[in-house]
Amino acid sequence: SCSLTLDNTDGALSPMLASSPYYPNVKPQNRIRVTHRDPSVPGNLLSAENSSFEGGTTGTWTRSASGVTLANSSAQAWTGTKSLSVAWSSSLKAAWIPYAGLVIGRTYTWSAYVYVGGVTGSSVGIGVAGIGASGTRSSWNNTWGRLSYTFVATSANHFLEVSIIGSTTRTDYVDGAMLDEGSTLAAFTTTPAPIVHRFDGYVDEWPIEWPSGGDNDSRSAVRVFDLQSRLSRARTLDSVITETYRLDSPGWHFPLDESSESASAGDRSGSGSTLEARQVNTGGELTFASGTGPGTDGASAPTFAPVDRYNGLYLLGIAPEVDPLGRHRTLSAVALTSTLQHQCIVEWCDAYGVGIILGTNSSGNAVAKWTNPWDTSKNVTVTSASIYADGQTHTFAATLSNDGAGTSTLRLYVDGVERGTAATFTTAAIGYILPQLKRISVGGTAFGDMFTGTISHVAGYGSVLTTLADHHAAASTGFAGDRSDERIERIASWIDFPAALMNLDVGDTTIGHVDSTGKSPWSYMQDVADTEAGVLFIDTTGVLTLHNRTRGYDSAAAVDVSVSAEVIDPDVRLASGIAGVVNDITVSRSGGASVRVVDAASVSTYGVLGESISIIGDSDLDVLNRANWELAMRSTPVVKLPELTLDGLTEPGTAAAVRGLDIGSRVQITGMPSQAPSSAADLRVQGYTERIGAGGWTLTANTTPFLPIAPLILDDDPRGRTDSTNRIAY
């Protein structure tokens, strides 16, 4: 988190104050970034290609309107060998580049070198669309000159332009384009601006205070939390199956996991629809929560027990039409049966019975049908070669697509794989849309074909799904075998977390199936990271970051900061204690082994120091390896430097590096006093507290030894020696 005290004397940060320049946008969850820019070092906010065009493209430059033609050119160049050619053929036109990421109220200087290709036509100017232009325009011909414009950003997004006024027909050239903070026109460079990000988060609330009791002193002391807070507060997750289905936007989805007291089933996609029990002729039973579903959702399923094919109970409901003007559908369900007769798992049809049916035939084969009581020539069936009425749980799906030229195609999928031979029927070639499929029947139809067994997770979609293999994996394995980074990405996708805000190391551990029902996204991700034995955090740029466990024993990792003991805070202390020491450890995994390992020598010296760890890996070998690795790292006390305060502002040679520290950074201290066990300390940052104010800039890091034990590294001396303390890494 970040705490900021901001001056609000002008009322700019007062919520709902109409005179605020930000009105009405001062709200909770406003995004705040804390960055540092060394004003003495020039830099370019534009990319190298947008600045110098040496890659052979026009970058993201574009024209304001017709009458301007842009191209990459080697005919002229102010620097390098290429530039942006701008062919004018009209008046009041501009070549411009959109730039996003400006800070409202901050001063910037925009500049470019322009080669004016002749004496006729308009002079060339430079400016920012919607703000203004420089009063100085080009006064040269057939040579290069530099134009610049200093402005204050009024939006996060602006168009930076090079423009003409009067009618002009000639070709000019642009090169050496540069955007930088401040009002000083610096020498051109393609080096990125030296901006250091220290925090990125969202305001919890906007408090307004008057410390002096009057209008002359108003402040807002805000608390800002990073994305971890948002992930912790996000909606709780549903089952792995429901979350996977949601990625494909079902029109309706009935998990059928209601309690035994239920008489109806509810939709989880948001349509508000329900399914209720209906009798066909006489007899039979339909009991909620009396069976089990796929197993990966940890939920029950209803059991259908009819008297025979034409007597029993089924579920019936009406759902809003999915994609009313569309020509494509997918119908899916999870079911278990061993009955060899014509059975309907789920039917999706209109009020007259025109629609799709998923079921089995009298031989136990899976079938998908398109039925049309008004025109039986359109009736088609796809039948699987294998028998799936085999007492096992299977995922069934049918897709219906229309090519817009008069042909519809029906396909059958079982367990994520297409089965049987696709069937086609003809439709109108122009303007064809599907009947209004609204009626949903589960476990039978109004005319019979009653189902015996369990059914769950019936769903309908307004598209032809290409992800049915994922649907089957969700229902069969729960994606067991995902790497740790893949599982975190999967969880993120369930809550629409942007991929651009993730930076995940490739995981070293595979994750087992986990019932995600009721979990918060952050706690689930953290369980994955703990199983990886890695670190999951939000970095200083606001990006969700995973460091895999390999980083924990990477002896070749670069040193981020190296300082002399003479310049660190005098309050620094070394300590060696039993905090964190474990010599009797039990590691277990859900649905798998539980392993206990003990370091007898450590127990003899320090007494029993026990701990239990639960992981969600998918291998019992991982359990054993994790237990031995934890014991190797933690059974003996190490010398720690728990807190290290560093100067991030004035210390020559190291202040800039300190401003770049983050979780996982490597810090080395040289020249330790003679009383220390070693003349140097090699440390890993596990967390930190940063203070920035009029009195200076300090960073107090919580650290641990960079390598708690020495890893065995083959072909390395001394790490490759097997007769020393080097240990095989987990």
Predicted regions and their residues:
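Intrinsic-disorder/low-complexity, polar/charged segments enriched in Ser/Thr/Lys/Arg/Asp/Glu/Gln
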Residues: 3, 48, 94, 107-111, ...
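Short edge-strand/loop segments of extracellular domains
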Residues: 128-133, 348-354, 415-418, 548-554
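Assembly/oligomerization scaffold segments
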Residues: 1-42, 174, 194-241, 258-469, ...
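Extracellular and organelle-lumenal recognition/adhesion modules and their flexible linkers in secreted
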Residues: 41-194, 285-298
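Acidic, small/polar-enriched beta strand-loop surface segments
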Residues: 41-50, 60, 72, 86-90, ...
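Surface-exposed coil/turn segments at beta-strand junctions on protein surfaces, enriched
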Residues: 27, 77-79, 103-105, 139-142, ...
